[in-house]
Amino acid sequence: MSDGAVVRALVLEAPRRLVVRQYRLPRIGDDDALVRVEACGLCGTDHEQYTGELAGGFAFVPGHETVGTIAAIGPRAEQRWGVSAGDRVAVEVFQSCRQCANCRGGEYRRCVRHGLADMYGFIPVDREPGLWGGYAEYQYLAPDSMVLRVAGDLSPEVATLFNPLGAGIRWGVTIPETKPGDVVAVLGPGIRGLCAAAAAKGAGAGFVMVTGLGPRDADRLALAAQFGADLAVDVAIDDPVAALTEQTGGLADVVVDVTAKAPAAFAQAIALARPAGTVVVAGTRGVGSGAPGFSPDVVVFKELRVLGALGVDATAYRAALDLLVSGRYPFASLPRRCVRLEGAEDLLATMAGERDGVPPIHGVLTP
């Protein structure tokens, strides 16, 4: 498509106001690129943006799990990223200046130049060229973008799992240093919970338990065994501490809490950890929500290691793409709902619990 051609994008102008706007494609220079979006995965962040629970600088084009084909690329960008026009790529949410101490140390989530302000799917449209997210037919890639090549035999829809699976690998294995034989408990059976279970089992965990809550999680818990779980527990029915102890004779070496808007889950994560165990907290609770039932003294008496987890890095993303290509787990057959631009609002409302029916485990926008 030529420079100046008109393309469509979905713009979130305000909470629950998602509209189609037209944008002209920018001229690509030596250091930037343009991606034809084939698929963009949706997660909890997307529906929190949609409802306004996650405050943003309206208006913006959402979408931070983009997979697409390079439509145009400058020569220096081609050399920097190691990709060419026609290659399928996954676009990381963070940008990296590649120069500050954080970026040189691999912590580009904390890039001094970009940080959280320049995440794809969050940048206001009044910053040219406006096409800063995956809810669009084309997405602009700035010079400091981070992209990964996607194998040609991996469908774009499945490839969008590079993001949640990368999170599962980093949160469930890398950060807690999960070892072969470890007992791992994953709280939350959403896409990132299933991915964390798969990653832990893939790293050699001896036993993996996944927990959920009530009918909304029933289908997800039923899938857990296909993604590495040895035990799935509905905490509305059974005590997860008792269930894990019965199966393993003890508590978890590693607990990964990926629940969202579930304040009481943190106390449960602490209860599930063995003395000197590790608890990774990746699910956010919302400002001011607190942690009902949590006593800091338990952390002291059990000498727990409690670690926060923010985002993913290139190492985990590459491992995720390799795992997807391997076919070890049935990610391709995950129950997913794919929609065009016109169907995005209904899908987001469903994921936010504002429509009848159970939200899909994997939501994908295919512009």
Swiss-Prot record:
Alphabetically ordered keywords of this record: Metal-binding, NAD, Oxidoreductase, Zinc
Obligatory cofactor(s): Zn(2+)
Gene coding for it: adh
CDD domains: MDR
Alphabetized Pfam families for the sequence: ADH_N, ADH_zinc_N
EC id: 1.1.1.1
Record bears the keyword NAD: yes
Textual note on the cofactor: Binds 2 Zn(2+) ions per subunit.
Binding residues for Zn(2+) 1: C43, H64, N163
Domain of life according to the entry: Bacteria
General remark: Was identified as a high-confidence drug target.
Catalytic activity line of the entry: a primary alcohol + NAD(+) = an aldehyde + NADH + H(+); a secondary alcohol + NAD(+) = a ketone + NADH + H(+)
Claim: Oxidoreductase is one of the keywords in the record: yes
Family note: Belongs to the zinc-containing alcohol dehydrogenase family.
Gene3D superfamilies in the record: Medium-chain alcohol dehydrogenases, catalytic domain (3.90.180.10), NAD(P)-binding Rossmann-like Domain (3.40.50.720)
Gene Ontology molecular function terms on file: alcohol dehydrogenase (NAD+) activity; zinc ion binding
Binding site for Zn(2+) 2: C97, C100, C103, C111
Protein name (Swiss-Prot/TrEMBL): Probable alcohol dehydrogenase adh
Entry-linked InterPro entries: ADH-like_C, ADH-like_N, ADH_Zn_CS, GroES-like_sf, NAD(P)-bd_dom_sf, Zn_alcohol_dh
